[in-house]
């Protein structure tokens, strides 16, 4: 069995879909379906069982037997960069992750987890090293601190000549693609611009967006990276992005091209995002490629075109 936490979410459900495509369906999805709309991400997936995230962690902490587990993909988290309840974020993203990590280490179960490019903050160097990290929001900090916790475990194991089972973290950059319709304000720019155009409006970008560039990565490619690392058993913390920074306007132009009409309009930059907003991200893929991962990443033009074709059927 493979367990996918956050399996009803965007990245988690795409990982499940990719596993299904490879013929694997002995999958336990763990999530919180309080927002019942997320069920739509599971309807076309072939899984063995579903469990609420609180029931799951209770059983994990009790050391319950789940039977043979081939791997755990830990994608579950509060991913809202606008959430400032630090106690909630640290309990949900940090403490929960630690419990699950130690469960896996004790049983030598491969543990592949979601980190984030939000760990880097305001920098122009995106290398998986402590010197380049400086989260701008509490979500980013929760991910940064868990990465540091994992690093400490590796250092302790090395000091005692021990080898830990596989632990792999992925610093996701700006992920977009199918199965994100439940995310509300945290859905991708492509998703929001498409909704605007379907409502008969022009696509709207924040003022100053011509200066903002992000590494926009297609969720299908993200899922492929996760499966590559499981199949190859490689540990480490790795950037998961295209290695290219593209302007928000490139996303808007790809959406406009699909619809065959429209022009970009600008709206004021939100006050609540000032000082907590990454204006530039670009994954350094040196470490990912050195590990042997050869997954090719779609450009914004190609990825958004594929995405638009899927959600505008």
UniProtKB/Swiss-Prot annotation:
Chain's role: Catalyzes the interconversion between ADP-D-glycero-beta-D-manno-heptose and ADP-L-glycero-beta-D-manno-heptose via an epimerization at carbon 6 of the heptose.
Any one of the GO BP annotations: carbohydrate metabolic process
Protein name: ADP-L-glycero-D-manno-heptose-6-epimerase
Keywords of this entry: Carbohydrate metabolism, Isomerase, NADP
Enzyme Commission code(s) on record: 5.1.3.20
Complexes and interactors: Homopentamer.
Protein residues bound to NADP(+): 10-11, 31-32, 38, 53, 75-79, 92, 143, 175, 183
Domain notes: Contains a large N-terminal NADP-binding domain, and a smaller C-terminal substrate-binding domain.
Cofactor note: Binds 1 NADP(+) per subunit.
Family: Belongs to the NAD(P)-dependent epimerase/dehydratase family. HldD subfamily.
Cofactors named for this entry: NADP(+)
